[in-house]
């Protein structure tokens, strides 16, 4: 109401009560939930939460209900200066007003991105999944569930940045990074299922710089 154009983003593990998320309705524009596991044995071992998938899947459903399918706008419509800066003030205002009224869906986002245009998400859900060592089959179950449940209603980010830390020494299978073969197997599976709205990570991105300072 007072001119704030930046979308409000909510970053979450998805291990949340639906009742809590309903309190956020109307305040959050973009949800960034994780969907870590489907297998209760894996979620119990690594997160002490046998009910993780039950809770997380219900939470994600509520997020999608709230914000709906993804929408994108030009970067300038989100409050940044862009290439219109070189135009006269009156022309720049006209361009800005036109772009503020242009909203793109996921398919149009893909097309314009490939053409070199830079769009920002205005609303939507991006579900993140971190591939972990020795968990390829469960990762496939995660991807399958998301695609069969939501299709093009969401974006899926398949992440390759798992970083082993000293605290994981009690789990020897987690003492290494995800191999290229493991990550590629998950990405290839998503492609086989027909994923359209997705993000992948290329190269070696497993670094401690991805881990926040929680202390």
Residues of each region from the PLM?
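Core AdoMet radical
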Residues: 1-21, 25-73, 200
């Amino acid at each position: 109401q007072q001119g704030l154009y930046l979308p409000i983003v909510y970053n979450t593990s998805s291990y949340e009560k639906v009742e809590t998320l309903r309190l956020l309705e109307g305040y959050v524009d973009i949800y960034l939930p994780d969907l870590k596991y489907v297998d209760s044995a894996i979620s119990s071992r690594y997160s002490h939460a046998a009910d993780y998938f039950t809770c997380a899947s219900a939470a994600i459903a509520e997020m999608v209900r709230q914000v709906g399918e993804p929408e994108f706008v030009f970067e300038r419509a989100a409050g940044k200066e862009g290439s219109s800066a070189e135009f006269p003030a009156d022309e720049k205002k006209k361009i800005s007003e036109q772009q503020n009224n242009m909203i793109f869906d996921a398919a149009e986002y893909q097309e314009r991105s490939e053409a070199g245009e830079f769009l920002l998400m205005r609303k939507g859900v991006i579900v993140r999944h971190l591939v972990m060592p020795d968990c390829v089959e469960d990762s496939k179950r995660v991807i399958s569930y998301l695609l069969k449940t939501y299709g093009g209603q969401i974006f899926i980010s398949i992440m390759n940045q798992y970083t082993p830390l000293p605290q994981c020494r009690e789990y020897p299978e987690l003492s290494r990074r995800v191999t290229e073969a493991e990550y590629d197997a998950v990405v290839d599976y998503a492609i086989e299922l027909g994923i359209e709205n997705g993000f992948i990570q290329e190269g070696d991105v497993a670094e401690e710089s991805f881990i926040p300072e929680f202390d």
